[in-house]
Amino acid sequence: MDLKTIAEELVAGCRENRAIENLDRLYAPDAVSVEAADMGRGRVTEGLAGIRGKHEWWDASMEVSDGSVSDPMLHGEHRFAVIFEFQGKEKQTGKAFEMKEVGLYHVTDGKIVREEFFY
């Protein structure tokens, strides 16, 4: 897949609640995910299984009541960015949250090899 197709499919998957399903299609097996801050699980997650675990943790821990995912913004031949905005609550505590973050994705050989989040 080319950059534009990967970017559009990542966004569509997020909007249609297919993010975990898209991992195998869009990510390299050795992809790396980097968070802006350590939320108790470390900032860096390596490998597709670890990234899948992050998604599963989010789904188990957070209840999203509203949100949006921007259209992808392409940058050159190998990168794109997406803006995520969500409102919801932590399932365990009921504490409400609002978040806005930018995801920067790096693509090599038709797969996402690195994602970085800024918030």
Question: Which residues are covered by each model-predicted region?
Answer:
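Short, cysteine-centered beta-strand-loop-beta hairpins and adjacent loop/turn segments enriched
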Residues: 61-63, 87-98
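A short hydrophobic beta-strand element
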Residues: 76-86
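Short beta-strand edge/turn micro-motifs at domain boundaries
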Residues: 100-119
